[in-house]
């Protein structure tokens, strides 16, 4: 008799995705981040659900309701901090996952890659709206500044901003709709992640060499289930160290002050995971130009497959491209640092140079290096 997991309509799907899935025998720990992102998403949905039971999306009571969760709800503080720091872990995993994709040429799986870029945008939108909900100073002013960027769109900009606000400023209507969107988006992300996985399983996973691994596959279970469980333990360990020892390390002190439309904080900045894009936005002295650069800084990922000029898929055997990749990582870390600094000398010029370097590396230097490496192979 055939095993039920191979015949049952529902179990068959799970079996083909997580048990009998043929996986390359040589995928490294960089391939762990997909499952870690799934764990992060589940964790965020669960903690978010419990927070929503006690939160009120009203300008008069939102800040107080978050304080109430932390002070009066049983284990409310741990749920709140797991949710806030869970977002940081989510983005660490996301950046690692995307970086892996760039390094090993995984972007040649076009559908998988493009859905991944949509997932990145959706996650960024969710995180932004979630940051507005506690209704602290940085929540309010962050929402005001970022939504205001849409006014740079010619002709329809102003109307669009007022439509999103639900009035003439960020107010009760804005908070209510942001809560609604923040609640629904993670489920859309979960659905998209399923499609992401569906397309990945059409082709099978890439591997560090970038060469077809059809001749050498192993079953996903037990080899990669145990590996994913180890990764999950390390993720939970890192998250709980953050939550239990330094829960406010990555937050902004300004967000412990209730939102006040009459008092602007001296330095408006988003959470750390948006700082690189924020630095690119600020480095262009024109509003529309800055907004375009901001969007392009993420949308440029869609161009990755078109910019792939190398005869090899992975960077594993391409030292020049490897060097440029790590310069890109250093550049992104520089942008992240600049995004958190005030707009003054020397930070302005450093940010502008780092922004130019970012686009130059992806659009010009990396494709050029690939072409040079192709020619070196002929020698």
UniProtKB/Swiss-Prot annotation:
One GO cellular component assignment for this chain's record is: respiratory chain complex III
Record PROSITE patterns: CYTB_CTER, CYTB_NTER
What other comment is given for this protein? Heme 1 (or BL or b562) is low-potential and absorbs at about 562 nm, and heme 2 (or BH or b566) is high-potential and absorbs at about 566 nm.
Instruction: Name its species.
Output: Ourebia ourebi (Oribi)
Annotated binding of a ubiquinone, by residue? 201
- Entry's cofactor comment: Binds 2 heme b groups non-covalently.
Where does the record place it? Mitochondrion inner membrane
Q: Name one GO molecular function term.
A: ubiquinol-cytochrome-c reductase activity
Chain ranges passing through the membrane: 33-53, 77-98, 113-133, 178-198, 226-246, 288-308, 320-340, 347-367
Q: Which PANTHER family match?
A: CYTOCHROME B
Q: Which InterPro entries match?
A: Cyt_b/b6_C, Cyt_b/b6_C_sf, Cyt_b/b6_N, Cytb/b6-like_sf, Cytochrome_b, Cytochrome_b_C_euk/bac, Cytochrome_b_N_euk/bac, Di-haem_cyt_TM
Give the protein's function. Answer: Component of the ubiquinol-cytochrome c reductase complex (complex III or cytochrome b-c1 complex) that is part of the mitochondrial respiratory chain. The b-c1 complex mediates electron transfer from ubiquinol to cytochrome c. Contributes to the generation of a proton gradient across the mitochondrial membrane that is then used for ATP synthesis.
Question: Where, in this chain's numbering, is heme b b566 bound?
Answer: 97, 196
Q: Where this protein primarily resides, as one coarse class?
A: mitochondrion
Q: How does this protein lie in the membrane?
A: Multi-pass membrane protein
The UniProt similarity line reads: Belongs to the cytochrome b family.
Q: How is the quaternary structure described? A: The cytochrome bc1 complex contains 11 subunits: 3 respiratory subunits (MT-CYB, CYC1 and UQCRFS1), 2 core proteins (UQCRC1 and UQCRC2) and 6 low-molecular weight proteins (UQCRH/QCR6, UQCRB/QCR7, UQCRQ/QCR8, UQCR10/QCR9, UQCR11/QCR10 and a cleavage product of UQCRFS1). This cytochrome bc1 complex then forms a dimer.
Which top-level group of life is the source organism from? Eukaryota
Q: Which cofactor does it need?
A: heme b
Chain positions recorded as heme b b562 binding sites:
83, 182
Q: Which Pfam families does the record cross-reference, listed alphabetically? A: Cytochrom_B_C, Cytochrome_B
Keyword vocabulary terms for this entry: Electron transport, Heme, Iron, Membrane, Metal-binding, Mitochondrion, Mitochondrion inner membrane, Respiratory chain, Transmembrane, Transmembrane helix, Transport, Ubiquinone
Lineage per the UniProt record: Eukaryota, Metazoa, Chordata, Craniata, Vertebrata
- Gene Ontology BP term (one): mitochondrial electron transport, ubiquinol to cytochrome c
Indicate what this protein is called per its UniProt record. Answer: Cytochrome b
């Amino acid at each position: 008799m055939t095993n039920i997991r191979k015949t049952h309509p529902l179990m068959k799907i799970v079996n083909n995705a997580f048990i009998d899935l043929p996986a390359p025998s040589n995928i490294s720990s960089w391939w762990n981040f997909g499952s870690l992102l799934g764990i992060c998403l589940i964790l965020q949905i669960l903690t978010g659900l419990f927070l929503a039971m006690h939160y009120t999306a009203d300008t008069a009571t939102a800040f107080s309701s978050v304080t109430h969760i932390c002070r009066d709800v049983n284990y409310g503080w741990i749920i709140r901090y797991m949710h806030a720091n869970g977002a940081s872990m989510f983005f660490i995993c996301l950046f690692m996952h995307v970086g892996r994709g760039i390094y090993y040429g995984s972007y040649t799986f076009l559908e998988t890659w493009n859905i991944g870029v949509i997932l990145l945008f959706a996650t960024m939108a969710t995180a932004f709206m979630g940051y507005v909900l506690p209704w602290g100073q940085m929540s309010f002013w962050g929402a005001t500044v970022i939504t205001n960027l849409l006014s740079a769109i010619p002709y329809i900009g102003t109307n669009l901003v007022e439509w999103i606000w639900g009035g003439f400023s960020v107010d009760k209507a804005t908070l209510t709709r942001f809560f609604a969107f923040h609640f629904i988006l993670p489920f859309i992300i979960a659905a998209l992640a399923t499609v992401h996985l569906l397309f990945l399983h059409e082709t099978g996973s890439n591997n560090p060499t970038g060469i077809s691994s059809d001749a050498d596959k192993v079953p996903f279970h037990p080899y990669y289930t145990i590996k994913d469980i180890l990764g999950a333990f390390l993720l939970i360990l890192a998250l709980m160290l953050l939550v239990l020892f330094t829960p406010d390390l990555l937050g902004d002190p300004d967000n412990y002050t209730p939102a006040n439309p009459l008092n602007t904080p001296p330095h408006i900045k988003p959470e750390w995971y948006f700082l690189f894009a924020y630095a690119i936005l600020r480095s262009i002295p024109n509003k529309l130009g800055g907004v375009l650069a901001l969007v392009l800084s993420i949308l440029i990922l869609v161009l990755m497959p078109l910019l792939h000029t190398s005869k090899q898929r992975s960077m594993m055997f391409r030292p020049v491209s490897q060097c440029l990749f790590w310069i890109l990582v250093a550049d992104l870390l520089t942008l992240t640092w600049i995004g958190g600094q005030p707009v003054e000398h020397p930070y302005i010029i450093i940010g502008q140079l780092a922004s130019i370097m970012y686009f130059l590396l992806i659009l010009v230097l990396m494709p050029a290096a690939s072409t040079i490496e192709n020619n070196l192979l002929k020698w």
